[in-house]
From Swiss-Prot:
Residues 267-326 bind DNA. PANTHER family: LIM/HOMEOBOX PROTEIN LHX, LIM_HOMEOBOX PROTEIN LHX9. It comes from Homo sapiens (Human). Its main location: nucleus. Interacts with LDB1 and LDB2. InterPro entries: HD, Homeobox_CS, Homeodomain-like_sf, LIM_Homeobox_TF, Znf_LIM. The lineage of its organism: Eukaryota, Metazoa, Chordata, Craniata, Vertebrata. This is LIM/homeobox protein Lhx9. PROSITE patterns: HOMEOBOX_1, HOMEOBOX_2, LIM_DOMAIN_1, LIM_DOMAIN_2. Keywords: DNA-binding, Homeobox, LIM domain, Metal-binding, Nucleus, Repeat, Zinc. The gene is LHX9. Residues 353-364 have a biased composition (Low complexity). Involved in gonadal development.
Amino acid sequence: MEIVGCRAEDNSCPFRPPAMLFHGISGGHIQGIMEEMERRSKTEARLAKGAQLNGRDAGMPPLSPEKPALCAGCGGKISDRYYLLAVDKQWHLRCLKCCECKLALESELTCFAKDGSIYCKEDYYRRFSVQRCARCHLGISASEMVMRARDSVYHLSCFTCSTCNKTLTTGDHFGMKDSLVYCRAHFETLLQGEYPPQLSYTELAAKSGGLALPYFNGTGTVQKGRPRKRKSPALGVDIVNYNSGCNENEADHLDRDQQPYPPSQKTKRMRTSFKHHQLRTMKSYFAINHNPDAKDLKQLAQKTGLTKRVLQVWFQNARAKFRRNLLRQENGGVDKADGTSLPAPPSADSGALTPPGTATTLTDLTNPTITVVTSVTSNMDSHESGSPSQTTLTNLF
């Protein structure tokens, strides 16, 4: 877009200064100013004519009185001294506007043409940009920095958690569901809300056709080829599954899936082994409270060295197995899976009752000489056992 020179005539430029009102200037000075302006206009006309003869003004065709140019905007004749040349057409200064926002483009450095219409830079990228932000659905210019997640592209300011609007940067862990981005904390909350604790991993996979809610990391894209082993099993956990039975002489394992793969590929599972003192602590507290709150989980995490997430899932699966064992006990008292008899519920006179005011505190859970109170059902009495290794809670798993 260029501002093209004045109209060319044979001898002089037709420009004449309009009548002006001068204050405080004598008549002689006014006459001198008028003569100087006329002299300059004649000089400009001679230079323009010489440039045209030398072929240096091929891109700026002058307007001649014989064949006046027509404005591409309004269709009228261009009689102004200056006009605009854009997309090989002549325009009045006032007629070159964006067709969307009506912004005058005479002072802009660039303008865009599409299907015969003129656009400013912002409207052109908004309407015809190749890529759009998956959050605000506005165009992304080629010079902007973006964040990529799966097949979606986001502005840096739009790559935030859909729940808390926390800005996610490179290296942060996040999750995606239905093209929405979540930070790690709210993604875990979303997982817990969608999948009830009593459902196991196999039931979830059978219902949903495979888990489709993996964690992502801002430093990379979707993994291709052979999966990598994770250094820390606590990172990138999708669903944690409690495996087999609890035994003090054998270590328990939590199965952790990596990113989901098609059924034709084999999935590798990361296993976390519990140490004996960790198992004793968790079992002892489970005998007191089947559903610990956040404060109790924090204390257990400090005592066992496990994360709150691992402890949550262990208690969820322990509660589910405890309920299954109670159902089997009501149906006959025999566990058909392992062929062992479950202990009968204690009667009202089956031992000394533990006073309610002497509940075992969390700091005493690893003491081998403590008294463990086992709660079988809500309407049954508690009884006293000798030590954690002989408690009836162990047989329930």
